[in-house]
């Protein structure tokens, strides 16, 4: 994550990504505090900062993606950065609800993850799928905002694409 890694190390990661032409995966825009502190440090969001140092030039993935604005979503779409939602972790840590409908509308590949055992007591993909389906419904007050096909795609081909695997 941007907030746990020095600028120098992140720039080194970007150099390696360029050298080996490889995507980078990291926690991204998980909490409001993370985004606010990054804006204080660099004058831009974590997505914008990491893009500015070339970290996303070969695509990759951002875990969580809860606090992203339209500019962030556009960068992720253009740079082919998948967003991997971790709804149980985000609920347990009160990080917020990822705006999956806005991310989908922006044309970003979406996947579902569990995060780690310290922030998720179950590591149960079926529970994650359920929460990925129902939390946006609460956020939007719309029972149809994310349907079963969206969630199944996120849990299968969306995950494969996020990892760079063919569908």
Task: Report residues per predicted region.
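A short linear-motif detector with a strong N-terminal bias
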Residues: 40-42, 89, 131
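His/Asp/Glu-enriched, well-ordered alpha-helical/loop segment
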Residues: 52-59, 101-167
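Generic beta-structure capping elements
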Residues: 65, 86, 132-134
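Short, acidic/turn-prone active-site loops that include or flank metal/cofactor-
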Residues: 30, 87-91, 116-118
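Histidine/acidic residue-rich metal-binding segments in metalloenzymes
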Residues: 1-82, 94-110, 127
């Amino acid at each position: 994550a941007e907030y746990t890694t020095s600028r120098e190390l992140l720039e080194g990661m970007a150099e390696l990504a360029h050298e080996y032409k490889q995507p980078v995966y990291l926690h991204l825009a998980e909490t409001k505090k993370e985004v606010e502190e990054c804006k204080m440090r660099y004058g831009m969001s974590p997505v914008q900062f990491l893009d500015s140092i070339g970290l996303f030039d070969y695509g990759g993935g951002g875990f969580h993606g809860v606090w992203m604005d339209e500019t962030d979503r556009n960068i992720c779409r253009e740079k082919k950065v998948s967003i991997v939602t971790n709804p149980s972790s985000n609920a347990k840590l009160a990080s917020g609800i990822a705006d999956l409908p806005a991310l989908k509308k922006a044309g970003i590949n979406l996947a579902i993850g569990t995060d780690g055992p310290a922030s998720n007591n179950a590591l149960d993909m079926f529970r994650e799928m359920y929460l990925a389906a129902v939390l946006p419904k609460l956020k939007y007050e719309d029972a149809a905002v994310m349907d079963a096909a969206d969630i199944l795609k996120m849990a299968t081909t969306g995950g494969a694409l996020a990892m760079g695997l063919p569908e």
